[in-house]
From Swiss-Prot:
GO terms for molecular function: calcium ion binding; calcium-dependent phospholipase A2 activity; phospholipid binding. PROSITE patterns: PA2_ASP, PA2_HIS. It comes from the Eukaryota. The active site is at H47, D89. It is an enzyme of class 3 (hydrolase). One of its GO terms (cellular component) is extracellular region. SUPFAM superfamilies: Phospholipase A2, PLA2 (SSF48619). PLA2 catalyzes the calcium-dependent hydrolysis of the 2-acyl groups in 3-sn-phosphoglycerides. In vivo, is non-lethal to mice when intravenously injected up to a concentration of 30 ug, however does show significant edematogenic activity at the injection site. May form tetramers. This is Acidic phospholipase A2. Ca(2+) binds at Y27, G29, G31, D48. Disulfide bonds join C26-C115, C28-C44, C43-C95, C49-C122, C50-C88, C57-C81, C75-C86. Its cofactor is Ca(2+).
Length: 122
């Protein structure tokens, strides 16, 4: 669920998910095309690809379960599809955290007109 994704970003990357990543580069936020602009945008590209591999549930709307154990996010629940969504979200939040040092404000509200190059395959 997109709100849960925001929660995981807050917990893991210590950033407001929607504010920092809702409108960043060519892939962070709704849709995505072109070439990822930097490491953070690549996190979103990989997250989009991850969602694209999920079958049997709706990554943007289905609610999943997770817990925090020793500072780590552990995806759980009986539904393997929802667990997969959680893992996509968790991995993206970790990617954001690991690339905070290269986050570049010039890609915040990046004009989509610059995202015209052919997308690379997932």
């Amino acid at each position: 669920h997109l709100l849960q994704f925001g929660d995981l970003i807050n917990k893991i990357a210590r950033r407001n998910g929607i504010l920092y990543y809702g409108f960043y580069g060519c892939y962070c936020g709704l849709g995505g095309r072109g070439r990822p602009q930097d490491a953070t945008d690549r996190c979103c590209f990989v997250h989009d690809c991850c969602y694209g591999k999920v079958t049997g549930c709706d990554p943007k709307n289905d609610i999943y379960t997770y817990s925090e154990e020793n500072g780590a996010i552990v995806c759980g629940g009986d539904n393997p599809c929802k667990k997969e969504i959680c893992e996509c979200d968790r991995d993206a939040a970790i990617c954001f955290r690991d690339n905070l040092d290269t986050y570049d404000n010039k890609y915040w509200f990046f004009p989509r007109k610059y995202c015209k190059e052919e997308s690379e395959p997932c």
